[in-house]
Amino acid sequence: MKINRQQYAESYGPTVGDQVRLADTDLWIEVEKDTTYGDEAVNFGGGKVLREGMGENGTYTRTENVLDLLLTNALILDYTGIYKADIGVKDGYIVGIGKGGNPDIMDGVTPNMIVGTATEVIAAEGKIVTAGGIDTHVHFINPDQVDVALANGITTLFGGGTGPAEGSKATTVTPGPWNIEKMLKSTEGLPINVGILGKGHGSSIAPIMEQIDAGAAGLKIHEDWGATPASIDRSLTVADEADVQVAIHSDTLNEAGFLEDTLRAINGRVIHSFHVEGAGGGHAPDIMAMAGHPNVLPSSTNPTRPFTVNTIDEHLDMLMVCHHLKQNIPEDVAFADSRIRPETIAAEDILHDLGIISMMSTDALAMGRAGEMVLRTWQTADKMKKQRGPLAEEKNGSDNFRAKRYVSKYTINPAIAQGIAHEVGSIEEGKFADLVLWEPKFFGVKADRVIKGGIIAYAQIGDPSASIPTPQPVMGRRMYGTVGDLIHDTNITFMSKSSIQQGVPAKLGLKRRIGTVKNCRNIGKKDMKWNDVTTDIDINPETYEVKVDGEVLTCEPVKELPMAQRYFLF
């Protein structure tokens, strides 16, 4: 029997050659391959295939390659490709991507993807599925940030802080063993993966190393604590020994040295450069030149993404609050003004589109918005398509190349940068099942369901007193994956190898899954998926004009964006 493409898409989701629009943007993705097509496409419901003796095998037990969870007919958007597949989950990890079902009566069922009595099903046909987002720049100021992050499809937070202390409001740092231990205990109750950054400042190695041994997953150097060449060198020395990443917010005022001095202190070692454009902080006015170096892993924070008519105006007040500055002190105002440059913010848009800036993050509650990392990534992509047109690599009128470039900025690339790509960051076999389902019309704006470790943790769902799940008010709510002891199974605390070897999780009584940070020091820009371009970036110190290979990079701020007021009442 044959049905037309429209009927097929309505029943099983789009297939090869079909295109799907992302939210209300001008971006379209095309299905590159379909692993579920043919035989009887697996779906669930009354009169459907996934019944005992049909798509479900009722004879196999869970120990016989039967899945715990099957996502059917998902349109996967990942650095690995844009394709249709079933996703099989067992013990909280992805064990198969292909075709699920009953191999006794169905052709082409992927090994390890047997649907049996033990299997739960999520109908993903008509949905886009991405890996959970990874935000590497979070100020741990308010635990309510977690719900906001989950709503935008973010499942991992790396950062520092102890609450609304002045040090935490300004710097992503949890300072010293005592504070690190307390935050490790506190984050036990959060339904999100966590890695804590220690303070990368000390006159000797010992005060830095003791933080790594206490459970820090990396180090942060920040100008508000003194981003001196000596601090940079010592932190990188510790990082090389402990195999953790160092993130840097360099010296805006150029007091301890200029960009060249910072690069000299880094000395070719790998480092993660936060808000590399500079509005969030860093050597004024040329910090963005770091983005072109092969050992620098550059990221943006979301308040400058993308460049709009409001971007400049909102930054000054944000900066004064976050860095404990006073409006009546001229030097404080001058410090703030030096960081806000329309020319470099405009160029930042284009550097993302060229694959020179590799990652996105939020700077949550400290000049950034915890729930807008994914949203602003795709707003930037849409703005660039409208202003620069399709990329040369695109085919068939789709935006697949650009889509893979931009989705990598908040999934696989931050995972690689922070040494956690063996656990999270992509939809691949062996990865922890942190998955986000999106309705295409709400893509990047409001996640339909967020799966943590194979269990639904957050979902758009209706009135809990209703007779069915859909009556209004439909809103994002925490689900069973966040309740009781299950929260320990569905979330990972990432820690340094040395702290795990020294028994810190047991000493602190941690119950969550523990993930080891590793492979941070043998990487570089070349490892940033779809965003590995190195080049010379020249910034004029007087006009702030940005050039790459002699070409001036600039674009106009926009007055309107997609994925904005159409989706939000407030």
UniProtKB/Swiss-Prot annotation:
Under which EC number(s) is this enzyme classified?
3.5.1.5
A biological process (GO) annotation for this entry? urea catabolic process
Alphabetical list of Pfam families matching this protein: Amidohydro_1, Urease_alpha
Query: What keywords would UniProt list here?
Result: Cytoplasm, Hydrolase, Metal-binding, Nickel
Top-level EC class as recorded in UniProt: hydrolase
Cellular location(s): Cytoplasm
Cofactor (UniProt): Ni cation
Q: How is its activity regulated?
A: Inhibited by fluoride.
Q: Which residues carry this modification: N6-carboxylysine?
A: K220
Please list the GO terms describing molecular function: nickel cation binding; urease activity
> Which pathway does this polypeptide act in?
Nitrogen metabolism; urea degradation; CO(2) and NH(3) from urea (urease route): step 1/1
Q: Which reaction does it catalyse?
A: urea + 2 H2O + H(+) = hydrogencarbonate + 2 NH4(+)
Disulfide linkages recorded for this protein, renumbered to the chain, are: none
An example GO CC term for this entry is: cytoplasm
Signal peptide start-end? none
- What HAMAP family does the record tag this protein with? Urease_alpha (MF_01953)
Summary of subunit composition and partner proteins: Heterotrimer of UreA (gamma), UreB (beta) and UreC (alpha) subunits. Three heterotrimers associate to form the active enzyme.
List the protein's name.
Answer: Urease subunit alpha
Q: Which organism is it from?
A: Sporosarcina pasteurii (Bacillus pasteurii)
